[in-house]
A protein has these predicted regions:
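Membrane-interface amphipathic/juxtamembrane segments adjacent to transmembrane helices
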Residues: 31-60, 159-175
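Non-transmembrane accessory domains of multi-pass membrane transporters/channels
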Residues: 162-238, 243
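Membrane-water interface of alpha-helical transmembrane segments
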Residues: 5-15, 70, 125-132
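Soluble C-terminal extramembrane regulatory/interaction domains of multi-pass membrane proteins
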Residues: 171, 223-226, 230-373
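Cytosolic juxtamembrane amphipathic/interface segments immediately preceding
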Residues: 58-76
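Transmembrane alpha-helix/interfacial motif
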Residues: 7-39
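Pore domain of cation channels
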Residues: 18-25, 77-162, 243
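Hydrophobic alpha-helical segments of integral membrane proteins
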Residues: 40-55, 108-115, 119, 134, ...
C-alpha cells in the first residue's frame, strides 16, 4: 500500500539526507585533494581499530600482533566501501518507500536492485524511475571511485616504503638515531667514513616527509598501512632520522651538515604534527622549548657511548650538548610518540610507550665474526 501523503515528506527527507551523507563522505575521501573531515569514514576507522585491538591484544608476541594488524588497512577500505553502500542503500530505500506499492520491503528490494545494478526490480511511475536511475548511478560511481582510489594509495605506499627500506641498512632494524650515525661513520665496516653522505640523506628525508605529510593527511587510511617487515615502521624510521639530526647538531656542530639537518628536522616534525592532528591528537604546532623530553640523560649517554665505539667525531661534552639535543627533540617527540602508539609501531629504542606494555627492541646487529650489516 502506498504511504499516505503525511508520511511521505519525513521519509523522503530522511532518505535524501542519508544519500547526501554517503555522497559527501565519498567525495571528501576519494575526490577532494585535501583533508576534509568525514565522520562516517572516521567512525569506520575507529570501529575497525577497536576490533583489531580486541583481537591483537590477546597475544603477547609482538610478531603475532603485527601479523594481525597487517590486514587492518584493507579492513578499513572494505569497511568504508560497505558503509557508503549501506548508507546510500538505506537512503534510496526511504526515498522509494512513499511510492512502493508493497510497503517498505518493496522499497528496499527496488533500492537494492538499482544500487547494486542487478536490475531485477523496476518500479512503476516517473518519480520512482528517476530515483532508481540515481541509485544505479550512485552505486556504480562509488565502486568505480574506490577501484580507481587503490593505485593512488599503493603508489604513495611504495614511495614511503622505498626510503624506509634503504634506511634500514644504515640505521638497523628497528631503526635508531644513534645507530644511524654510528653505522654511517663506520661505513658498514669498510673503514672509510661516509659521513659526507648525510647531507644527501637529510635532503631525501626532507622530501620524504613532505610527500608523506601530503599523502597521509589527504588519504588518512595510508596511516594504517604497515611496513612489510614486522620490525620495520615508517614512523620509527622518521624518528630515527630526526634523532640523528638532533644528535649530530648537538654533539658535532662543526662537522654536522647544519642546513640540511635543520631543514630535515623542520620538515619531519611538521609531517608528524600534521598526521597526529589528522588522528585527532591535540599536539601544539610549536611546543614550548622548555617542555622537556621523556628521555633521560643516562639514555643520552648510552647513545654517545654507541657513537664513541666507532670513533664518531664528538666535538662537545655530552653535558654541554644535552640541552641542545632536548631543544630539538621537544619539537617532534610528542607527535612521534602519539602516532607510533596509535599505529602500534615496533617499540624501538627512544620511541615511547605503547598501548600494551612492551620492552624496547634494540636494532639488530651482526653476530661477532660476521661482516657488519
Amino acid at each position: 500500500m502506498v504511504m499516505p501523503l503525511a508520511g511521505r515528506v519525513p521519509a523522503a527527507v530522511a532518505g535524501g539526507l542519508l544519500v547526501l551523507v554517503a555522497v559527501y563522505s565519498v567525495t571528501a575521501t576519494l575526490i577532494v585533494s585535501r583533508r576534509v573531515n568525514s565522520r562516517l569514514t572516521r567512525w569506520v576507522d575507529q570501529l575497525v581499530d577497536w576490533a583489531y585491538q580486541q583481537v591483537a591484544g590477546r597475544f603477547a608476541d609482538p610478531h603475532r600482533r603485527d601479523q594481525i594488524r597487517a590486514t587492518q588497512a584493507a579492513a578499513v577500505l572494505l569497511g568504508q566501501l560497505t558503509a557508503w553502500l549501506l548508507v546510500a542503500y538505506a537512503g534510496f530505500a526511504l526515498l522509494l518507500w512513499p511510492f512502493a506499492s508493497r510497503g517498505v520491503v518493496s522499497a528496499f528490494i527496488d533500492a537494492g536492485s538499482s544500487l547494486f545494478t542487478l536490475g531485477f526490480a523496476v518500479p512503476a511511475g516517473a518519480v520512482p524511475a528517476v530515483i532508481v536511475f540515481l541509485a544505479a548511478a550512485t552505486g556504480l560511481v562509488i565502486l568505480t571511485l574506490q577501484i580507481a582510489y587503490l593505485p593512488t594509495l599503493y603508489a604513495a605506499f611504495n614511495r614511503r616504503e622505498t626510503q624506509v627500506a634503504l634506511l634500514n641498512e644504515r640505521a638497523g632494524i628497528p631503526s635508531w638515531g644513534p645507530e644511524l650515525l654510528a653505522r654511517t661513520y663506520y661505513a658498514l665496516g669498510s673503514g672509510v667514513s661516509t659521513l659526507d653522505t648525510m647531507p644527501d640523506l637529510y635532503e631525501r628525508w626532507e622530501n620524504w616527509a613532505a610527500d608523506v605529510a601530503e599523502s597521509h593527511t589527504t588519504y588518512p587510511v595510508l596511516i594504517r598501512f604497515r611496513s612489510p617487515g614486522p620490525m620495520s615502521s615508517w614512523v620509527i624510521s622518521l624518528l630515527a632520522v630526526l634523532d640523528s639530526a638532533a644528535l649530530f647538531l648537538a654533539l658535532s656542530p662543526k662537522t654536522a651538515p647544519v642546513v640540511p639537518a635543520r631543514l630535515c628536522l623542520r620538515g619531519g616534525f611538521r609531517c608528524l604534527h600534521r598526521i597526529a592532528q589528522v588522528m585527532d591528537f591535540d599536539i601544539p604546532d610549536e611546543p614550548a622549548p622548555d617542555a622537556g623530553t621523556s628521555l633521560t640523560y643516562e639514555q643520552f649517554l648510552e647513545a654517545v657511548a654507541r657513537m664513541r665505539e666507532v670513533g664518531f667525531p664528538i666535538e662537545r661534552d655530552p653535558a654541554e650538548a644535552w640541552p641542545d639535543f632536548v631543544g630539538w627533540r621537544v619539537n617532534y617527540e610528542q607527535a612521534a610518540y602519539a602516532v607510533a602508539a596509535e599505529v602500534y609501531a615496533v617499540p624501538a629504542l627512544w620511541s615511547g610507550p605503547r598501548r600494551h606494555p612492551m620492552s624496547p627492541v634494540p636494532p639488530q646487529r651482526p653476530a661477532p665474526g660476521r661482516p657488519p650489516k
